[in-house]
Amino acid sequence: MELGGAAGALGPSGPLLVCLCFGTLAAQAADTCPEVKLVGLEGSDKLSILRGCPGLPGAPGLKGETGAAGLKGERGLPGVPGKAGPAGPKGSTGAQGEKGARGEKGESGQLHSCATGPRTCTELLTRGHFLSGWHTIYLPDCRPLTVLCDMDTDGGGWTVFQRRKDGSVDFFRTWTAYKQGFGSQLGEFWLGNDNIHALTAQGTSELRVDLMDFEGNHRFAKYQSFRMADEAEKYKLVLGAFVEGNAGDSLTDHGNHFFSTKDRDNDESPSNCAAQFQGAWWYHSCHSSNLNGRYLRGPHTSYANGINWKSWGRYNYSYKVSEMKLRLT
């Protein structure tokens, strides 16, 4: 049957029904059907389709032209520093700079100090240094030497070259140690044979020995002159007459004798007096005094190896304090 005849046979509603039939067939051929809403069939005979089925995707269009470059972004944060690279080649020396301004005048050098500085503790005393203590003096060869000056005893001006006071320093030492000197400014010391020789070579010096026992008793011995020869003469003791002192004379017997240590035997005894009596001294055979002996703290049963002074205490008493000092006359 032709569609036109069929629509005419259905009367005034025929065209609408034909369209609905075709819509139904199309919806069955697809998975989904459009949502249809009939509006005004009785009045206006109109049909409104609110949503139809989606069509098949179209072919992709042509690629568009590249757009213009965007604006440059802001600078980012700095990254983590990398490892240091190898050192570059050394550059060439630059041009010489201009001469600088003249500096301030420096302090006087040693030669000037030697020419004008004090030579002895006696000279320091005459310059107004009245306090006992450590001072710098200058030897004849311009060497500076720090010494302990006793400005209190017997008029002052004494240079102390030996001090024993507490046993803190071992005096049983070698020839080299006595040559150079040893000990502490705060305690016990030996100034050194070379230094003692240099001090006594400046002129005539007197000698004083001060002793104190462990009961607090003080005694002394004083000699008219004192000189120590140089190492070539084995530091021989050249001693003047005993002048005074309540300690008595226990050093005259050692005059004109050589200095001996445990490793350098220059005495007149078949044995080594320094090794036997554990000291270092101008031994003959062997001694009347041994002020560089062992620190034995008063009475001792051992024989003659302490800080002994025969004329006071004999050979079995070791003194608490011993000081040997010289003064240029």
Swiss-Prot record:
Chain spans, region Disordered: 64-113
Main location: secreted
Matching NCBIfam families: GGGWT_bact
Domain Collagen-like, residue spans: 52-111
Quaternary context: Homotrimer. Interacts with elastin. Interacts with MASP1 and MASP2.
Keyword set, alphabetical order: Calcium, Collagen, Complement activation lectin pathway, Disulfide bond, Glycoprotein, Immunity, Innate immunity, Lectin, Metal-binding, Repeat, Secreted, Signal
GO biological process: complement activation, lectin pathway
Gene Ontology MF terms: antigen binding; carbohydrate binding; carbohydrate derivative binding; metal ion binding; signaling receptor binding
Name of this protein: Ficolin-2
Organism of this sequence: Bos taurus
Location(s), subcellular: Secreted
Coiled coil: none
Entry-linked PANTHER family: FIBRINOGEN/TENASCIN/ANGIOPOEITIN, FICOLIN-2
Family: Belongs to the ficolin lectin family.
Glycosylation sites: N316
Disulfide bond sites: C114-C142, C121-C149, C273-C286
Organism placement in taxonomy: Eukaryota, Metazoa, Chordata, Craniata, Vertebrata
Function: May function in innate immunity through activation of the lectin complement pathway. Calcium-dependent and GlcNAc-binding lectin.
